[in-house]
Amino acid sequence: MKLPHEFYQLPFRFDVGQLAKEIEQFTESDWVTHHEGFQGNSAIPLISVNGEFNNDFKGPMLPTAALAKSPYIKQILASFGEVLSRSRLMRLAPGAQVPLHSDINYHWYKRVRVHIPITTTEQVQFFCHDKQVHMGAGECWIFDSWKLHKVENNSDQYRVHLVVDLAGSSQFWRTVFQHSRSIADDQSTTLNSQFVGFNPDSPATLITEQFNAPVIMPVAEVEYLTNELLAEVKHNPENLVADVNAFSLLIADFVADWRMLWLQYECTKAGWPHYHALREQTMIKALLCAKSLQLTHSGSAVKAFEQLVIVACMNVELSEQLATRKQAITSPKNSPESANLASVKSASATSTSTSIIPKTAAENNARTIAAPPSRNSPCPCGSGERYKACHGKVN
């Protein structure tokens, strides 16, 4: 995700000793090697598609067996009070590194990765664009994954981080921009951090993503993503004007033709061959006319276009699964599916109420005072005012 600055330290601290105890239970066979073969990189999935040991991005995110036996880690994840995507323990061997790369696919464009170091040393350095930091054990960090970044472990010890991907609510981003410390801020000042310890008597409830990829991407999102890419391409002074103009025309044609197909077929199967043909033809043209174009700090524009838009705009393999889950959500109140939905809502309320993300006074009031049937009714707080002029007042 793009951020105004390369790094932000969030105002939370966690119990490193308890975290270390929980990762000690895992054996070497539990650690899965990196899916792209990065030497010295391994991980243990904690939240994944269908709760399985995979590297998938699309589908319902569920806790894995590894998370089920890690109560403090589960409490930490739940403490954010956010809708969670993928989570894992990420390990970097002594002397190893995470190679220089940028996260340009659809999943990470609007999701940030939260890092909580568990075992680390000063010799572990995280680089992003032209900045670098050491993330201390028990701290909480996010970074701009759209920019090129890498990690070096120049120590003789394993580095292990707990990470979780999330899109972030307004409360989360308010915490980032109002209560956190960016790499541009004075690093000599003390960050006022909240300690989140382990409570063995407090069960944790997670809220996880259920819908994270469209069968066919709506026109508005296609247009938004392509405009974002195009703006960055135009902003890079090293790109040739002729190539930028050719890419601009290609994007405009693609969006216009996608809109025509959407108006005719929306997500129905009859349109699938036409959507596929359009994205295939567009990608071929992009490779011919725009292969030299570069984003500002993130590498190839054509590669980003492919990963962010072309690959992501059509996921027909999810159609039956999504239809079944949507039907369950809209089923009658007395059905088993409705009971499951009620439990999800209950879980959401429970998790949000214990969130470490600060709430505004208005949000706290809204949770304390139940709304009456009509906004013109007397406010339940007993003030004598109408609800709309008291606790229901819209600022």
Regions found by a protein language model. Give the residues of each.
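Non-heme Fe(II)/2-oxoglutarate
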Residues: 1-79, 186-196, 251, 271-326
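Conserved short histidine dyad/triad with adjacent acidic residue
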Residues: 89-107
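Short beta-strand His + acidic residue motifs that chelate non-heme Fe in jelly-roll/DSBH
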Residues: 100-101, 124-126, 143-144, 148-155
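A short hydrophobic beta-strand segment most commonly corresponding to one strand
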Residues: 110-117, 140, 156-174
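A short beta-strand-loop-beta hairpin characteristic of the jelly-roll/cupin
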Residues: 117-137
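Charged, amphipathic alpha-helical linkers/stalks
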Residues: 163-240
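Acidic/negatively charged segments and metal-coordination signatures
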Residues: 324-395
